[in-house]
A protein has these predicted regions:
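Membrane-water interface of transmembrane alpha-helices in multipass transporters/channels
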Residues: 1-7
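Conserved catalytic core of two-component sensor histidine kinases
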Residues: 8, 15, 138
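Cytosolic ends of transmembrane helices, especially the final helix of ABC transmembrane type-1 domains
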Residues: 13-41
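An intracellular "coupling" helix at the cytosolic face of ABC transporter transmembrane type-1 domains
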Residues: 23, 27-30, 47, 70-75
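Conserved E/DxxT/N motif and adjacent residues on the DHp alpha2 helix
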Residues: 40, 47, 160
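Flexible, glycine-biased helix-capping/connector loops in cytosolic signal-transduction modules
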Residues: 44-47, 189
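Pre-NBD coupling/linker segments of ABC/ABC-like ATPases
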Residues: 47-59
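ABC-type nucleotide-binding domain
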Residues: 58-295
Length: 295
């Protein structure tokens, strides 16, 4: 009996210590995540806005070619390995793959948020992307991400990011022309509906519609879509994809998705697995090559 009492006493003393050790481990893991994020941020090079080359002729992006691009975050294993693909005006290409394979990072590199470890990105067949100022480049492209930013303001403000009455009228005409009006007419005050933290709480699909209208209103030469229809219902998604197909003669489109049905509508598919392009071709070519498991 005495031995059992001693064991119970020792156990009662060990349990609080074990709990403290578990809490300490949680704090260490949280600190590690914070350190990795700060290390990644501190390792980023400052953006340069100076134009290195004479780019007076860059009035329109006719094509973009990614050539053997590789990338890794500081202190981590390689995320993208020898990625090569191209897109030109009049095309919608698709980067197809599961979450975590590097699709989103590829678009972030194209937006100049990250610099590739190796490889080149060429614009209009001959211009190195690094020779174009970041500011100028971003006036030529537009993007829609899976996580949409809705600003405090009206629906109009969120689309045009301006306040002039003249531009407001242009936005309304734009939305009618492109078919967004049928989605926005259900908002309580239509285009004057207040959105954001102090406004109407809209669904994820509606947020993506706002973001897509915002991107297309900029009239970009290159449109980057990162799971941009993932929160939409099937009917809305199909209508939006058909809209994009009808607009592609005016611009190039890169669609990032894990949805097979969305990928089938693109002109060309690049399948990414573990940071590598493992298959590429039109949907029809992938089927003929017995690679239909990808589509």
């Amino acid at each position: 009996i005495g031995g059992l009492v001693a064991i119970f006493q020792m156990t009662s003393q060990l349990i609080p210590s074990a709990n403290k050790l578990a809490l300490t481990n949680i704090q260490i893991q949280e600190a590690r995540v914070a350190f990795e994020r700060m290390y990644e941020f501190a390792s980023m090079e400052p953006e340069m806005n100076e134009e290195v080359a004479d780019l007076e002729n860059l009035k329109f992006i006719e094509n973009v070619e990614v050539d053997t691009l590789s990338f890794r975050f500081p202190g981590r294993s390689q995320l993208l390995k020898n990625i090569s693909f191209n897109v030109k005006k009049g095309e919608m290409i698709c980067l197809l793959g599961e979450s975590g394979c590097g699709k989103t990072t590829q678009l972030q590199i194209l937006q100049r948020f990250y610099k590739p470890e190796t490889g080149l990105i060429k614009v209009n067949s001959s211009i190195n992307l690094e020779e174009i100022s970041t500011k100028k480049w971003r006036t030529k492209i537009a993007s829609v991400s899976q996580q949409v930013k809705i600003f405090n303001g009206t629906l109009l403000d969120n689309i045009c990011l301006g306040n002039s009455q003249e531009e407001a009228e242009q936005v309304v005409e734009f939305c009618k022309e492109y078919g967004f009006d049928e989605y926005f007419e259900s908002f309580p005050q239509h285009y004057l509906t207040l959105l954001g933290e102090e406004g109407v709480n809209i669904s994820g699909g509606q947020q993506q519609l706002v973001a897509l209208a915002r991107a297309l209103y900029q009239k970009p030469d290159l449109l980057l879509l990162d799971e941009a229809t993932s929160a939409m219902d099937r009917n809305t998604e199909q209508k939006i994809l058909k809209l994009l197909m009808s607009l592609k003669d005016k611009l190039g489109i890169i669609l990032v998705t894990h949805r097979v049905q969305s990928a089938k509508l693109s002109d060309r598919i690049y399948v990414i697995e573990n940071g590598l392009i493992t298959a590429k071709g039109t949907p029809q070519e992938l089927i003929k090559s017995n690679l239909d498991k990808f589509i």
